[in-house]
Amino acid sequence: MTDVTIKTLAAERQTSVERLVQQFADAGIRKSADDSVSAQEKQTLIDHLNQKNSGPDKLTLQRKTRSTLNIPGTGGKSKSVQIEVRKKRTFVKRDPQEAERLAAEEQAQREAEEQARREAEESAKREAQQKAEREAAEQAKREAAEQAKREAAEKDKVSNQQDDMTKNAQAEKARREQEAAELKRKAEEEAHRKLEEEARRVAEEARRMAEENKWTDNAEPTEDSSDYHVTTSQHARQAEDESDREVEGGRGRGRNAKAARPKKGNKHAESKADREEARAAVRGGKGGKRKGSSLQQGFQKPAQAVNRDVVIGETITVGELANKMAVKGSQVIKAMMKLGAMATINQVIDQETAQLVAEEMGHKVILRRENELEEAVMSDRDTGAAAEPRAPVVTIMGHVDHGKTSLLDYIRSTKVASGEAGGITQHIGAYHVETENGMITFLDTPGHAAFTSMRARGAQATDIVVLVVAADDGVMPQTIEAIQHAKAAQVPVVVAVNKIDKPEADPDRVKNELSQYGILPEEWGGESQFVHVSAKAGTGIDELLDAILLQAEVLELKAVRKGMASGAVIESFLDKGRGPVATVLVREGTLHKGDIVLCGFEYGRVRAMRNELGQEVLEAGPSIPVEILGLSGVPAAGDEVTVVRDEKKAREVALYRQGKFREVKLARQQKSKLENMFANMTEGEVHEVNIVLKADVQGSVEAISDSLLKLSTDEVKVKIIGSGVGGITETDATLAAASNAILVGFNVRADASARKVIEAESLDLRYYSVIYNLIDEVKAAMSGMLSPELKQQIIGLAEVRDVFKSPKFGAIAGCMVTEGVVKRHNPIRVLRDNVVIYEGELESLRRFKDDVNEVRNGMECGIGVKNYNDVRTGDVIEVFEIIEIQRTIA
């Protein structure tokens, strides 16, 4: 796993560097801001924090109460309704100091509420008593005045009216009692209303204080800070308790309080929903509207979007990016569609796309380099020694059979071409030779067009290109390719005009043809040296070596000889007895036996080194090609080889490269492009030739795969189901049987178990040693899958001289055959003024009232056209036939 620094980890955890250093110190790990953190130290910190915060922070209790409620319906029938009441209560473990502070605040709040309630009640009682006393005094005055009037009137009235006066006095007394009761009720309602207003004011103040405390607590987030939702639920419960006290205090007074009291015998009287309704009725007032909801939650939507620091690696899935931004995956997909990219939630996207999406959604992006370990391993190498002159690396290029390998054989005084099938070099050979003037390293590249990638790889590793051109053949297509590769690599070219001893040799023609491609000889004012050689007779070989060494002296080639080596893989293959074998060309430093090497996706310790002659060597300096053993797998040709110090880190880098390659490959495959849409629509109509390919070396596998894939057309595609280096195994045969594929072996053979599977499944197994035959046979197989081309061929013309009527066939054209032959039941066209007016079938063909099958040129006949009666004199009837032409792959 890649180590990160304290600063990077702090940015990811969104905390300060000082706090993170303090947390590491609490866990027993001393770190500074620039120190790196390993995976084990991360785990130690996490365990420490978990132990510190051990114990459940929340305890949630749930209760369900089920009952049945009978509701009267229409027609005197009652309906039973199942009611389920769910109660949920969460207990939160608080810090002791925080709990004491909250308890003190709650106690102070309760005391303030109780004091306010008592003061309000006393004030209401005093006001009601004073008002009652004032009204009683006024009533006494009125009664005294009325009594005086009655006494004066009684003196003037007769005694028989005393009974009526007694009745009036009783009625007046009842009216006074009623007025006193009404005044008392109004006083109680006024006191109750003031009490409710005071309670609401205190509750609102408590809510405001709770909201301020919440924002104060969230201002400095820490590791053990309480959850926002927990704090909100606490204050919500406090508000509910206050409202409950309001309802309890208001019971028995007023209509609203009576309405809020539950009925006797109701099973659900004490449910939370009923209490919520009662509180809503109290808050709403008389005839008021409910403002609260029994299911209202305490969460408030943020007023503005939260901008986050999003850490993005080199690849990330859409779902992971959405989680880092705390948004839904659908929002990320919508943002990508606005940017012109379509993706699914599990699709892997690259770093650039993820950065665009995150910045488009308003977040700050932190790009994390995942190859920090690889860079650290590569930089930890002792390559500071002084540079020394080194031998040139020469690549021999040219067309097929122009004499490249023969020229190199003569230089090395060995015969390697006899081991090459058909005299054609099948894979790269690397050799170094000692001359009187110095050492030269040669790379022999194949000349066939299929080995373009191998030849390009040779040009990347070379210093000088020797372009071999046959004097009797001139410039050929592969010669032009070699020139293009040399120019692309900016490598100087030395031209070797071979086969100069042949009588038909024409070196001037070679110079003229090469001058058209920018290769000018020195005598013409150019920069390229032309040497006339003969690989058979040995003519001009010394001059060619002198020209190479002269060019190398001009280039001033130097390399560091001491220190850890680096180079490139020229070729690799899997040997049955030795395992993975790689041919390595050392560029700098010295490669020793026992060194730890990192090579692309593979790594290992060099167990053995051999030179091109098969001899064991202990070290190899710059420009020396060697075969090394001990790698974990077969590397790809062209991979960089680097000597590192630590085998464990080399393994980590190799595994990281493998995972990175898979991720990038998957991202590339899943990326949906508009230009692929129509290709996907017609995918079901394409025939496929499935091939399982095995070859002796990795370079041949690459070259053959590229050549076969280039043969694909819109109708027939070549699909490489599997490929590899080594013999054909039982697994390869099983794969070919499952996928209905052709087994192709290039310079390899099938083992005994594979042959049994091949015979049992009747598989198509083919062996090749020359790539020409392989490509030609695959072309033939693909040509057989092509649908034939249909071509119309005109076989005869007949001119209409007269038209007759027939009760059986309708209009019969009396014709004269002017060209070719007219055959019965062939398709025809009717031409009028050289314009096709009808296309159909010849139904009837007669000559002298006899049915005939054909009529030749210069003869008269009667022609009946099927389902067509508009034949006129002067028309031309064109008879043709449809022939099938077998198509081939070009």
Swiss-Prot record:
Organism: Shigella sonnei (strain Ss046)
Residue numbers bearing the N6-acetyllysine modification: 808
Chain positions covered by the region annotation G5: 534-536
Taxonomic superkingdom: Bacteria
SUPFAM superfamilies reported for this sequence: Initiation factor IF2/eIF5b, domain 3, P-loop containing nucleoside triphosphate hydrolases, Putative DNA-binding domain, Translation proteins
Protein name: Translation initiation factor IF-2
Compositional bias per record (Basic residues), positions renumbered to this chain: 252-266
Family assignment from sequence similarity: Belongs to the TRAFAC class translation factor GTPase superfamily. Classic translation factor GTPase family. IF-2 subfamily.
CDD domains in alphabetical order: IF2_eIF5B, IF2_mtIF2_II, mtIF2_IVc
Start and end residues of each stretch annotated as G2: 423-427
